[in-house]
């Protein structure tokens, strides 16, 4: 069987994937900071993680995915105070919204979704280990990681070691900062009045954890000290992931993660997302524009994860057209009842076998999804050209291949009407179709057109075929 190859951000090379345990993959993905609704750039990272998981499952692995919820940090505390509401009540709303959104986008729920506030004890334990191993110091009641005690610091983000040494005397209390300000980072923040009632007692005094120690503690608890894959957006690479490596490897004296995978930034209409520019979108904003979740997902998935994605409304509409082409073929294939065998079917089956192999080659080569989709649509074109000659055996083989693709893409309608948001009663649909048929027989074409338009407004598309009227959900 062909190897899976991933680009490892740590080594900056493509590497054959070899899990620690033969049939299982331990995977950690940085989840949302629940201070607001997730925006479309966040969802690119979450859909990338979902794609990776589905490809690993396609290969035959059992995947244990851990995706955290950051429910205590600078932003969550600031926003909860501004809204005069407790941290727990404030973040609860956005936790629930996140789970609603990933369900809407067809993202599989993680095996575990640990919340930071439920794992303070584990964070304190790691900080105590780091202190014991000589990697920390205290200042003004806060505990910092001294990066000069960890020689490998900066390898993931490819920091200049000499510049790092020259500037390593500083320290930073903020959770987020850039490479130019690489400094000793905070593990435990001393309580200040700005924190309100958000604090925990610890051996270091009253306070709260830094952002970076949160993921270290939760990944360790659910995946162990050493696991296979860690993912996130490229903006997480530094300082967050760099600091995670330092914390875990300095605490436990062993390798933390074997493969680091990062997806690139998303821009909108060629520019960075900004509320002032009017190009800042949450999922809910896009749904309010009448765009389908499947088309949004397809738009976020159809470019290679290591390439910057230019997200546009026009692009979503093109994605919908691509989805409709496949859905239309699925719909028509299911009506085939021809049992005759012929040369066209034999050739199609051979081409299908080649397409399946090429699809594997693409997705197992660092998730080359754009190439994989190209293979699918080449086959769709071929099938449409030969459609009238296809028999049931070839039909079943084609549908099996499309179903395999969809288990990874999860954008097409394989016949599960519950997948669509339109849940109009089927009896009502069939009754309207019957009324339209009668109207046509009576040559009342105006009424027939009115019924067709009524069905369209319900999200139902009808087709007149030699076998009778067929309908599908748009």
Swiss-Prot record:
Alphabetical keyword list: Aminoacyl-tRNA synthetase, ATP-binding, Cytoplasm, Ligase, Metal-binding, Nucleotide-binding, Protein biosynthesis, Zinc
Broad class of enzyme this protein falls into: ligase
Localization in the cell: Cytoplasm
Binding-site residues for Zn(2+), renumbered to this chain: 30, 215, 240, 244
Motif ('HIGH' region): 32-42
Keyword Phosphoprotein: no
Superkingdom of source: Bacteria
Residues annotated to bind ATP: 275
GO MF assignments: ATP binding; cysteine-tRNA ligase activity; zinc ion binding
Co-factor binding comment: Binds 1 zinc ion per subunit.
Catalysis: reaction(s): tRNA(Cys) + L-cysteine + ATP = L-cysteinyl-tRNA(Cys) + AMP + diphosphate
GO cellular component: cytosol
Pfam family, one: CysS_C
Documented EC number(s): 6.1.1.16
InterPro entries for the chain: Cys-tRNA-ligase, Cys-tRNA/MSH_ligase, CysS_C, Rossmann-like_a/b/a_fold, tRNA-synt_1_cat_dom, tRNAsynth_Ia_anticodon-bd
GO biological process: cysteinyl-tRNA aminoacylation
Gene3D superfamilies: Cysteine-tRNA ligase, C-terminal anti-codon recognition domain, HUPs
Sequence motif: 'KMSKS' region, positions: 272-276
Protein biosynthesis among keywords: yes
Cofactors required: Zn(2+)
Quaternary state and interactors: Monomer.
Family to which the UniProt record says this protein belongs: Belongs to the class-I aminoacyl-tRNA synthetase family.
Name of this protein: Cysteine--tRNA ligase
Organism for this UniProt entry: Brachyspira hyodysenteriae (strain ATCC 49526 / WA1)
Gene: cysS
């Amino acid at each position: 069987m062909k190897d899976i190859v991933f680009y490892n951000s740590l080594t900056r090379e493509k590497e054959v994937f070899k899990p620690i345990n033969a049939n299982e993959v331990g995977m950690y993905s940085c989840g949302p900071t629940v201070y607001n609704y997730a925006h479309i750039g966040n969802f690119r990272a979450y859909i990338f993680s979902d794609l990776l998981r589905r490809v690993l499952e396609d290969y035959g692995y059992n995947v244990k995915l851990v995706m955290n919820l950051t429910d205590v940090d600078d932003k969550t505390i600031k926003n909860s105070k501004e809204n005069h509401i407790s941290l727990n009540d404030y973040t609860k709303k956005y936790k629930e919204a996140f789970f609603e959104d990933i369900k809407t986008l067809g993202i599989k729920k993680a095996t575990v979704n640990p919340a930071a506030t439920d794992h303070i004890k584990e964070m304190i334990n790691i900080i105590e280990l780091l202190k014991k191993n000589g990697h920390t110091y205290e200042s003004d009641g806060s505990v910092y990681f001294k990066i000069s005690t960890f020689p490998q610091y900066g390898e993931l983000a490819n920091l200049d070691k000499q510049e790092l040494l020259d500037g390593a005397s500083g320290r930073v209390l903020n959770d987020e900062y850039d490479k130019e300000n690489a400094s000793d980072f905070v593990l435990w923040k001393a309580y200040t009045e700005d924190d309100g009632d958000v604090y925990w007692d610890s051996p270091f005094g009253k306070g709260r954890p830094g952002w970076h120690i949160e993921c270290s503690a939760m990944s360790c608890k659910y995946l162990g000290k050493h696991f296979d894959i860690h993912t996130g957006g490229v903006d997480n690479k530094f300082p967050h992931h760099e600091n995670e490596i330092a914390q875990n490897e300095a605490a436990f004296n062993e390798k933390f993660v074997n493969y680091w995978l990062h997806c690139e930034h998303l821009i909108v209409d060629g520019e960075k997302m900004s509320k002032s520019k009017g190009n800042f979108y949450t999922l809910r904003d896009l749904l309010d524009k009448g765009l389908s979740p499947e088309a949004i997902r397809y738009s976020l998935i159809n470019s290679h994860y290591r390439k910057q994605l230019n997200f546009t409304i026009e692009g979503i509409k093109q994605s919908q057209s691509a989805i409709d082409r496949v859905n239309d073929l699925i719909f028509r294939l299911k009506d085939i009842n021809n049992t005759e065998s012929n040369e066209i079917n034999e050739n199609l089956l051979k081409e299908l076998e080649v397409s399946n192999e090429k699809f594997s080659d693409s997705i197992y080569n660092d998730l080359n999804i754009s190439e994989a989709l190209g293979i699918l649509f080449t086959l769709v074109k071929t099938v449409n050209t030969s459609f009238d000659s296809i028999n049931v055996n070839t039909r079943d083989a084609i549908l099996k291949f499309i179903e395999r693709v969809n288990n990874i893409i999860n954008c097409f309608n394989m016949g599960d009407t519950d997948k669509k948001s339109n849940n109009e009663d089927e009896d009502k649909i069939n009754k309207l179709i019957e009324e339209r048929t009668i109207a046509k027989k009576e040559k009342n074409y105006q009424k027939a057109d009115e019924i067709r338009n009524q069905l369209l407004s319900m999200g139902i598309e009808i087709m007149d075929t030699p076998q009778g009227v067929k309908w599908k959900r748009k």
